[in-house]
């Protein structure tokens, strides 16, 4: 039985690319045709590459590899969180903070701070700090949970990174390349297949397309751990009216600045 059928791919709109004027010529090998000024992705290739990706993910999981899912656009954020948690992977679904991988030791200090504040809250310690200090601590806790909650249990760099929207997540791509971490990515017709290791040509803008592809990759991880994929199908859809390009940037920058401050305060060896 195939990992995904052509009918499922069609029904989920995986074949719809971008307008022809917005294409990346390097994606030509994965484009079937153009209709009404829109490129159509070759689903026969997508189905085969999904087979390859599924087996790669499943076998990597069996061999103890750890995965990080990355998708910060509004259409992907809820799916990334739900599917990563379902299969036991780590995830980033808000903003990619600079140095999240290449400056991991410093980011991990912020993760430790998150755990410290969560423990303090659970023990009632924040309530005992007074109104002003308690409010400041809760604000800090909220920001850390939002941007680092998905990697709270990640104690080392991931072995493989799964990305939705290669163009948007270019900072994550760059850090993975610098560290030699394999990249699995959904590739729309405006993407560059040369920067990923395991390509999956697919519409990376439609919720149903993202849900199908990311869900199958999560199934592969689940199967690698438990022998059979989980078949649960519920997920939270993000409001299509939200501006996913700039979700609480100021709060994210404060988390990032705190990490950078730790670097500056660390004496050179």
From Swiss-Prot:
Any one of the GO BP annotations: translation
Gene Ontology MF terms: structural constituent of ribosome
PROSITE patterns: RIBOSOMAL_S2_1, RIBOSOMAL_S2_2
Record-linked Pfam families: Ribosomal_S2
A GO CC term assigned to this protein in UniProt: cytosolic small ribosomal subunit
Gene3D superfamilies to which the protein is assigned, alphabetical: Glucose-6-phosphate isomerase like protein, domain 1, Helix hairpin bin
InterPro entries: Ribosomal_uS2, Ribosomal_uS2_bac/mit/plastid, Ribosomal_uS2_CS, Ribosomal_uS2_flav_dom_sf
Keywords: Ribonucleoprotein, Ribosomal protein
Family: Belongs to the universal ribosomal protein uS2 family.
Cross-referenced HAMAP family: Ribosomal_uS2_B
Protein name, as recorded: Small ribosomal subunit protein uS2
């Amino acid at each position: 039985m195939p990992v995904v059928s052509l009918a499922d791919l069609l029904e989920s709109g995986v074949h719809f690319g971008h307008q022809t004027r917005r294409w990346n010529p390097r994606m030509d090998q994965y484009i079937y045709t153009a209709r009404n000024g829109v490129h159509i992705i070759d689903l026969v290739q997508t189905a085969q590459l999904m087979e390859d990706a599924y087996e790669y993910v499943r076998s990597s999981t069996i061999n103890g590899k750890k995965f990080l899912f990355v998708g910060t656009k509004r259409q992907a954020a809820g799916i990334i969180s739900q599917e990563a948690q379902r299969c036991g992977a780590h995830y980033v679904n808000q903003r990619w903070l600079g140095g999240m991988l290449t400056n991991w030791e410093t980011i991990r200090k912020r993760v430790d701070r998150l755990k410290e504040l969560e423990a303090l809250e659970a023990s009632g310690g924040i309530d005992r700090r007074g109104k002003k200090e308690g409010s400041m601590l809760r604000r800090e806790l909220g920001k850390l949970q939002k941007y680092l909650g998905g990697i709270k249990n990640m104690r080392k760099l991931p072995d493989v990174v799964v990305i939705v929207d290669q163009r948007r997540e270019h900072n994550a791509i760059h850090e993975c390349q610098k560290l030699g971490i394999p990249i699995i990515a959904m590739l729309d017709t405006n993407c560059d297949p040369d920067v990923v290791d395991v390509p999956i040509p697919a519409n990376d803008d439609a919720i149903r397309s993202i849900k199908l592809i990311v869900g199958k990759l999560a199934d592969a991880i689940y199967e690698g751990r438990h022998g059979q994929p989980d078949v649960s199908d519920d997920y939270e859809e993000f409001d299509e009216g939200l501006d996913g390009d700039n979700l609480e940037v100021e709060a994210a920058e404060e988390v990032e600045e705190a990490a950078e401050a730790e670097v500056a305060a660390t004496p050179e060896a």
